């Protein structure tokens, strides 16, 4: 259910703007998207897990805020990111 260390390192490597970059909006959105996708799969089996659903909504909100920030700062990076992650917007 959680992201493995290898998967997290791969996402950071794929979306980092420079070596060692873990705080850029692209990396944060990629990690949140991975966690959101994992929780979405979890809810297919555990429909009544409302405690985790609240966490999912918080993650979606956080991702939305980061995407809005990135769109405001650099539209080209925003477009590239949503294309790479397959986020519909």
Curated annotation (Swiss-Prot):
GO BP annotations listed:
translation
What GO cellular component entries does it have?
Answer: cytosolic small ribosomal subunit
Q: One Pfam family of this protein, by short name?
A: Ribosomal_S15
**GO molecular function terms noted in the UniProt entry:** rRNA binding; structural constituent of ribosome
Oxidoreductase found in the keyword field: no
Q: Which InterPro entries match?
A: Ribosomal_uS15, Ribosomal_uS15_bac-type, uS15_NS1_RNA-bd_sf
Provide the alphabetized UniProt keywords.
Ribonucleoprotein, Ribosomal protein, RNA-binding, rRNA-binding
From which domain of life does this come? Bacteria
Task: Provide the assembly information.
Answer: Part of the 30S ribosomal subunit. Forms a bridge to the 50S subunit in the 70S ribosome, contacting the 23S rRNA.
Q: What does this protein do?
A: One of the primary rRNA binding proteins, it binds directly to 16S rRNA where it helps nucleate assembly of the platform of the 30S subunit by binding and bridging several RNA helices of the 16S rRNA. Forms an intersubunit bridge (bridge B4) with the 23S rRNA of the 50S subunit in the ribosome.
Q: Which family does it belong to?
A: Belongs to the universal ribosomal protein uS15 family.
Name of the protein: Small ribosomal subunit protein uS15
Per the UniProt record, the lineage of the source organism begins with: Bacteria, Pseudomonadati, Pseudomonadota, Alphaproteobacteria, Hyphomicrobiales
State the encoding gene.
rpsO
